[in-house]
Amino acid sequence: VKNLLIENKDALKSMKEGDSKSNIRMTVKAVGDMLVSTNIVAAAQIPLAERESGITRIVQRQPFLLELVNVGTISSNLWEWVQQANKDGAAGMTAEGVKKNQIDFDLALASAPVRKVTAFIKVSKEMLDDVDLIESEINQELSEEIKLVIDAQVLSGDGTGQNLTGILENATAFAAGTFATGQANEVSTPNNADALRVAINQVMINQFQPNYILMHPSDVAAMDLAKATDGHYILPPFSTNSNTVVKGIPIVSNTGITEGDFLVGDFTKSGVRFREGLVFDVGYENDDFTKNFVTILAEARLVHRVKSNYYGAFVTGDFAVAKAAIAKA
């Protein structure tokens, strides 16, 4: 209709000016079906798409160690402490006129250095200006990357180079003790829960009170699904209905633990001190300025330690090896 009106604009003008003899006949084409493929030209934006706000991020493991250990701050680049070593003698009951009991020990200085965790992203100034939320998304990404590295280092850093010395590096290996095959407390057809119960006992006879058990999600699921030969689910008497607590100690499930392994410990004996918390810096580096690039940098400085006198607070092992070690002959 619009095109027909345009074609007859002169006649319409005459009618407007009072020419009663003017008339217009407009023939409209036959009605047809309207289709996206035929009635909407390629450049048209109809219908409009609906886009969700925000950015869908890649799924990553959730860090968890800092929620379990002793965390604080430090004002130096070296954490030092004094600990007892080579203790001799002991207190005892003493008769009248008899020499009293003597005790002596050495004092040893120990230390752990502060290490730095860093990550950066280069992004164009145009992208920061034109893409909504990109700066906050980059900050969140860098933050998560730093936290994941800290988490992994506190758990399993090997202490070499710029690595922290993690809990597993100093943890005590699983030892069956009196539960070993052939010993008085050997276990008939042991399962994963039995292995954990013996590990808990090991921590306790080392004079520590375990407060967390770390396991891979698949191993937790295996415990949940364990059945007897008649098909009923096995639930040890020292475990809760959901198998999330063993002998009063909660299980923390995370893929940071290698499948098949476990760690039982008193996590108050693991210490983290931050020299510098998570910090973000934004600036130009090298030829960034001439290329319109901005560098966003995130870093943190921290130290982790488990005192040598506390190594017995943590027991780590492999489920298969542990079960074989306590199995009744």
Can you say where each PLM-predicted feature lies in the sequence?
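Short, Φ-rich (hydrophobic/aromatic) sequence segments
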Residues: 49-61, 134-150, 154, 199, ...
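Extended oligomerization regions of viral-like shell subunits
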Residues: 74, 80, 158-302, 311, ...
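Alpha-helical scaffold segments that mediate packing/assembly in large oligomeric complexes
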Residues: 95-199, 311-329
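Short loop/turn segments at secondary-structure transitions that flank enzyme active sites
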Residues: 85-90, 118, 127, 148, ...
